[in-house]
């Protein structure tokens, strides 16, 4: 199945937070939810688990100054192409999901699209498809999207 069960391990690269209280809280959440995590720069450790049973969680809407040049909302920026690279290299589908909070403050999770890497020529086409989906999601409820303030910094 493409979708995790409560018993599946989740593998996720993370950025360590400098606030020790928040990082401690996040560690408890990761442990409780059966997450195996790696510092985001340590993809070699992440890849060592590629044949493990579990779910690989990769965030795609992250600006990387030295990342792939892409267009997002019609403007040039950069992006980590790692999810597309990993998907294409290992022939692993990408499941695009997002959450919405309703008027009662209840969070609903939606599965938007499953991207099968064999249907794309290269990782750049996969990233373009991912970001096209993100644009649709964001335009639906822009007030609920977490924006990075430097998304279009430096005019790339």
Regions found by a protein language model. Name each.
Residues 1-41, 65-70, 75-76:
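Catalytic core of membrane glycerolipid acyltransferases/transacylases, capturing the structured
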Residues 6-9, 44-156:
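Non-catalytic C-terminal accessory region of glycerolipid acyltransferases
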């Amino acid at each position: 199945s493409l979708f995790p069960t409560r018993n599946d391990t989740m593998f996720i690269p993370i950025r360590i937070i400098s606030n020790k209280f928040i990082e401690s809280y996040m560690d408890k959440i990761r442990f409780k939810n059966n997450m195996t995590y790696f510092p985001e720069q340590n993809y070699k450790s992440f890849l060592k688990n590629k044949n493990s049973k579990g779910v690989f969680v990769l965030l795609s809407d992250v600006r990387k100054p030295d990342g792939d040049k892409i267009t997002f909302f019609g403007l040039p920026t950069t992006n980590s192409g790692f999810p597309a690279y990993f998907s294409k290299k290992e022939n692993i589908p990408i499941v695009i999901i997002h959450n919405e909070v309703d008027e009662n403050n209840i969070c609903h999770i939606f599965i938007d699209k499953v991207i099968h890497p064999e249907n794309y020529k290269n990782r750049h086409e996969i990233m373009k498809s991912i970001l096209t989906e993100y644009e649709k999601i964001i335009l639906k409820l822009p007030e609920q999207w977490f924006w990075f303030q430097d998304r279009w910094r430096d005019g790339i």
